[in-house]
Design a protein with these regions (language model features):
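Acidic, Ala/Val/Gly-enriched low-complexity intrinsically disordered segments
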Residues: 5-8, 12, 20, 24, ...
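Cationic, low-complexity basic patches in intrinsically disordered or flexible, solvent-exposed regions
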Residues: 17, 27
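C-terminal capping/extension of enzyme domains
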Residues: 38-56, 78, 125-134, 138, ...
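Short, hydrophobic/glycine-enriched beta-strand segments
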Residues: 56-62
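Short, surface-exposed acidic-centric catalytic microdomains
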Residues: 67-128
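Internal catalytic-core helix/loop-beta-alpha segment
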Residues: 107-155
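Short, well-ordered alpha-helical microsegments
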Residues: 156-160
Length: 198
């Protein structure tokens, strides 16, 4: 990454970035603008799906975010509402550990995975995803009585419809994303839409 620092009051002239970079402007505590470029990375999914033979609901995301990869588990960003929302739907306390999260999913017959096995992506930006290799959902669908598949967000839904639906023949119901990038949706609004799963 390249870094350039100028006083906040100074006019900054930006040239167009190359196709595979995105320019991010941040305001630092001392009121200086820092411009950084974020390049594409090739990411391979490193988590196993969470399910067992009793799973009836499958929730699919896109790909683990940077924070999720750092924490080595699904929906690891502190501002992602997934675990808080799911706990509310299941009438349980919000789980904190990987073991608690996994146990809650399996208790309520919920399976989770993602639609992307590998891709090129800038940071955690779903809109930048390209060169997708999809996950093989057969390992779940062939071993569970999944009655409904849900997408956590529009991007996951679109990718499923493009890559997996022609193979599975199964429809997907797209739910609003729990990502912090979808901050316009409050937890209460998400709860109303997501209540269909439980």
């Amino acid at each position: 990454c390249s870094h350039g620092v100028r006083p906040a009051t100074q006019t900054v002239s930006l040239t167009q970035s190359p196709q595979d970079t995105i320019l991010v402007i941040k305001l630092t505590p001392n009121h200086q603008k820092v411009s950084t470029t974020m390049e594409y990375e090739h990411i391979t999914h490193s988590f196993e799906p969470i399910y067992n033979e009793d799973s009836e609901i499958l929730i699919l995301g896109t790909l683990p975010s940077v924070k999720s990869r750092e924490n080595n588990f699904y929906y690891g960003h502190k501002q992602n509402r997934f675990w808080k929302l799911l706990a509310k739907l299941c009438e349980e306390e919000t789980p904190q550990t990987v073991e608690e999260k996994t146990a809650m999913l399996l208790r309520h017959r919920i399976a989770i995975w993602d639609v992307i096995q590998s891709c090129d992506i800038k940071g955690s930006s779903d809109s930048s995803i390209k060169n997708v290799t999809p996950t093989d959902l057969k390992q779940i669908l062939d071993h569970c009585q999944i009655r409904q598949i849900y997408a956590n967000g529009n991007k996951a839904g679109a990718l499923y419809k493009k890559y997996q639906q022609p193979l599975t023949g199964r429809e997907i119901l797209v739910l609003p994303s729990t990502s912090p990038a979808n901050a316009a949706w409050s937890l209460e609004r998400l709860y109303e839409k997501w209540s269909v799963i439980h």
